[in-house]
Design a protein with these regions (language model features):
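Outer-membrane beta-barrel proteins
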Residues: 1-3, 58, 150-152, 194
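Residues on the lipid-exposed face of transmembrane beta-strands in outer-membrane beta-barrel proteins
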Residues: 12-16, 67-71, 87, 116-120, ...
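Outer-membrane beta-barrel transmembrane strands
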Residues: 2-18, 23, 29, 63
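Flexible, surface-exposed loop regions and adjacent strand-edge segments
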Residues: 40-50, 98-108, 146-151, 186-198
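Short, glycine/charged-rich beta-strand-loop motifs at protein surfaces that mediate ligand recognition
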Residues: 146-153, 159-164, 171
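C-terminal beta-signal and adjacent terminal beta-strands/loops
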Residues: 34, 135-143, 163-211
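Residues that define the transmembrane beta-barrel architecture of outer-membrane proteins
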Residues: 6-10, 59-65, 108-114, 155-159, ...
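Gram-negative outer-membrane beta-barrel transporters
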Residues: 23-33, 49-140, 181
Length: 211
């Protein structure tokens, strides 16, 4: 049976707002976890191959720093056309203590994450265009037990594009193209490729009606 994890959080944040639309913040944080729940991969017999389950580790510590900001540029009169750039970056150190295992990073926690957003908004014509880029560092996808190595998800970036058009006061068209870079998703175990595939492009189109 799994035990409910207990987490103590502490953080310190500095924020600066040079204008109503611009901002910058810097934060440091710390987490102390008892009985963290992690996904593990273990040996299995027969056709099952390696099986996955969840288990509690003894404890974990996590600490890091985060920087976040937003800057908006006026391209027209009275901010009727604007371009904005927003970013978020975090660096995280984690360490897990578990029975019969060497200290390692927390499952599912990359050591760094990066996000960049660039957006254009034309209020007069009703057009909005947003480009989003996310990048995550390598992390443990499954903890290896029974002498199995950990399964790692390699670092990967993803680029998405969102378009929005106000057809009327009540009707809005929104289209989203996901995974423009189509970077490979790659899992490794013991230095060898465990699984590799491409997610492909995703396309979503929706009409929103407000009444």
């Amino acid at each position: 049976f799994l035990t409910i994890s207990e987490v103590i959080n502490a953080d310190l944040r500095w924020e600066w707002y040079p204008s109503e639309v611009d901002s910058l913040s810097v934060a440091v944080f710390y987490k102390d976890m008892d009985d963290p729940i992690e996904r593990v991969v273990q040996l299995a017999s027969g056709t099952a191959g390696n099986s996955r389950t969840f288990q509690n580790s003894e404890s974990a510590e996590l600490y890091g720093a985060e920087v976040e900001g937003r800057k908006e540029f006026n391209l027209g009169k009275d901010f009727t056309r604007t371009l904005f750039v927003a970013f978020n970056g975090a660096y995280i150190e984690s360490e897990v203590s578990a029975q019969n295992q060497l200290d390692r990073e927390l499952q599912g926690q990359p050591d760094y994450t990066e996000k960049l957003i660039v957006g254009y908004d034309d209020i007069a014509s009703g057009h909005q265009l947003t480009l989003l880029f996310n990048y995550n560092g390598e992390f443990i996808a499954d903890v290896g037990i029974d002498q199995l190595p950990d399964v790692l998800l390699e670092a990967r970036g993803e680029l998405n594009l969102i378009y929005r058009y106000n057809l009327s006061e009540a009707l809005t068209l929104q289209a989203k193209v996901e995974n423009l870079l189509n970077a490979e998703v790659e899992y490794t175990q013991g230095g060898k490729v465990f699984q590799r595939y491409e997610k492909g492009l995703g396309l979503q189109v929706a009409f929103n009606w407000e009444f």
